Amino acid sequence: MSYLPNGAIVLPAGEGRPIPGDGLLIPNLVGKVTADQGSGSIAAMEGTAEPGFGPPIHIHHSSEELFYVLQGQMDFQIGDQRVSATPGTLVMVPRGTAHAPRVVGRERARFLVMFAPAGPDGLFYEIAALAQENGGAINDNDSRIEALTAKYDTEHVGPPLQ
């Protein structure tokens, strides 16, 4: 990673801070720009997830979340609407809106996910650390998950999409 004098960040392909997925709440992610880099105004991660993966319906109360599908197909529940996204599709979820993605079809999905302002990206790192403490898996009924989501002004409000 290169930090330029004007605050710009240049991150070559294949670089970033890995976040191992737990198969339940988070996909495999690589942090490209995190809350502790730059001004904290944006966080960006590259993700991959297998068909069927999708977190519970949730709300980020303090950040917008943006998804850009690079490969595969994903469905999104955004409020009371369900949309399908294929490569090249951008989905922007306003702060305070209940939403959830789900990988559909037979192909692994690859996507970018961004938060503005940065902040909720820290939740992924902390859940990954918790999963690692538990041998790589996590129970979505674990009370620590609720505490972590609250710490990052995020709230689970429904089950994963089917």
Where in the sequence are the language-model features?
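A short, N-terminal "cap"/entry segment at the start of jelly-roll beta-barrel domains
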Residues: 1-42, 135-162
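Ligand-binding loop in jelly-roll beta-barrel domains
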Residues: 38, 75, 95-121
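Conserved short histidine dyad/triad with adjacent acidic residue
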Residues: 30-31, 45-60
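Residue-level recognition of specific faces of alpha-helices
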Residues: 41, 65-68, 123-126
